Amino acid sequence: MNHSNQMHHDNHESHNHHSGHAHHHGNFKVKFFVSLIFAIPIILLSPLMGINLPFQFTFPGSEWVVLILSTILFFYGGKPFLSGGKDEIATKKPGMMTLVALGISVAYIYSLYAFYMNNFSSATGHTMDFFWELATLILIMLLGHWIEMNAVGNAGDALKKMAELLPNSAIKVMDNGQREEVKISDIMTDDIVEVKAGESIPTDGIIVQGQTSIDESLVTGESKKVQKNQNDNVIGGSINGSGTIQVKVTAVGEDGYLSQVMGLVNQAQNDKSSAELLSDKVAGYLFYFAVIVGVISFIVWMLIQNDVDFALERLVTVLVIACPHALGLAIPLVTARSTSIGAHNGLIIKNRESVEIAQHIDYVMMDKTGTLTEGNFSVNHYESFKNDLSNDTILSLFASLESQSNHPLAISIVDFAKSKNVSFTNPQDVNNIPGVGLEGLIDNKTYKITNVSYLDKHKLNYDDDLFTKLAQQGNSISYLIEDQQVIGMIAQGDQIKESSKQMVADLLSRNITPVMLTGDNNEVAHAVAKELGISDVHAQLMPEDKESIIKDYQSNGNKVMMVGDGINDAPSLIRADIGIAIGAGTDVAVDSGDIILVKSNPSDIVHFLTLSNNTMRKMVQNLWWGAGYNIVAVPLAAGALAFVGLILSPAVGAILMSLSTVIVAINAFTLKLK
């Protein structure tokens, strides 16, 4: 739990680094209320913007009270901005904090000068001070930043919730059978923990006793409860719905699923996309723009009116109204929100550039088995082509060779042989034949399991009519070869996933062409494609063929997304403009791919595209607001419309500046997946 909270803390700091004041977060609320106590007397005892009100709360020496309280307020309430500005200058990245620090410093220093002139100088006339403006300015800035920091924190709320899923303690089953409550940090791999109904599962693990239904909605976004039996994996942070289970711990701390996800999200939030680099650059220039406009406005108004009070007010207002912060946070806040929402729903964004590229995708290429289909095969037909070998003997030979493989087709054959009580042996020297099958020794005889492409390539005879009949029914067909003779075959069917058809329809509605890439035979590939509505099919592919096909499509200027197994399809995922590893489960860190889909649900492909579209829309809105606000507000503050009576005071400027950032934060917070 400590680790997860630390991960969240680090993540939170990372998406606030643009502000230059993340470390003042906890102080803004306290500083605001303490500063309010000092500010109220200043506001009551000072003339409002140089205007003597009908009611005056003054007394002999009250100007000294104002001076002392203003000095305390300047150094106490203004400290976050003064130290923030100092930090920005030290890193040679002056921004919003520097502008605010300049604004309040100019107001304070000039007010000291005015105090001296009014109380110790023999000069006639009254010099207006800015103590009232200084007090309201600091108050508004503190309040604005307090509200803003809350809004910024909420942007990553989904990730914060994930960090809080793990319990602080767990019930450990000791070697003697006794139960003992221990801290999560004391749990080790291979320990046995007991989890009762309704409790949060403390770590990733395997159920060794009991069965239950698990609520993974807060961990992977899976809305339905998942039935779990003995030997099934469970994820730390998910909720045990019913029944007491005992879980053997498989991963703790940094190796746990939640920690991996938060680590990946944290990394993604720290990596800057091209759009963010651009906005950072513009925000950097905005500081110099504001300072130049402020100085020019001061000079111009001095030339026009020869009124130092009014000219200085323009300068201070320009400095406090300019907000590079709104521009600097425009993208990071949306990123924090989108990556958090994605992780909460089992869509882990490892490469943020992919969110921008997703807007321009022309083709989505998908592996058939496991992506479009369940990958849970059933044996529909098996047959011997050799008179002295029975059908069950052929099944036994298939199962013997396949017992060394973890491919879905292999697992299906082994399970089927067991269900038929057909015995099989451990083969020797088993080797994988890439894109074909495998070979090995059984009773000193060499056998090969191949696909139909291998038979055609080596001109081996087989029953073409039987193949066509079974393949058109959607079966994947494997052949058994001994001494370059086909001695048997097995046909296995796979179910199309419920959400595949809708996913294909959604892609087509977005003018994105779905493409099937498969090592399976043409007949099966086209049968599945026809049912799904996919017209672009590439079958009987070797692993390296997928990568070259992607390359061909890209050579025509197309943007290609590849969806496949994060390990077996790694070269293709890397070659594509966006690589999506589907069905990663808890192994989110080991997969290739820009995007990791924890579940094997094809609809998550569309969910990612939707999230990308929504994210980019929010980014554009925030950038327009951040840039547009400054383009309009800075000239107004300089007095561009003073000739029609529109003049902004420093206090109003401070309100607008604070609001500009809060609006950006709130807009980011309204980002949704759907």
From Swiss-Prot:
Its main location: membrane. GO terms for biological process: copper ion homeostasis. This is Probable copper-transporting P-type ATPase B. The gene is copB. It comes from Staphylococcus epidermidis (strain ATCC 12228 / FDA PCI 1200). It comes from the Bacteria. Residues 7-16 have a biased composition (Basic and acidic residues). Residues 1-22 are annotated as: Disordered. It is an enzyme of class 7 (translocase). It holds the Pfam family E1-E2_ATPase. The active site is at D367 (4-aspartylphosphate intermediate). GO terms for molecular function: ATP binding; ATP hydrolysis activity; copper ion binding; P-type divalent copper transporter activity; P-type monovalent copper transporter activity. One of its GO terms (cellular component) is plasma membrane. The keyword Transport applies. Mg(2+) binds at D565, D569. Keywords: ATP-binding, Cell membrane, Copper, Copper transport, Ion transport, Magnesium, Membrane, Metal-binding, Nucleotide-binding, Phosphoprotein, Translocase, Transmembrane, Transmembrane helix, Transport. The keyword Membrane applies. Belongs to the cation transport ATPase (P-type) (TC 3.A.3) family. Type IB subfamily.
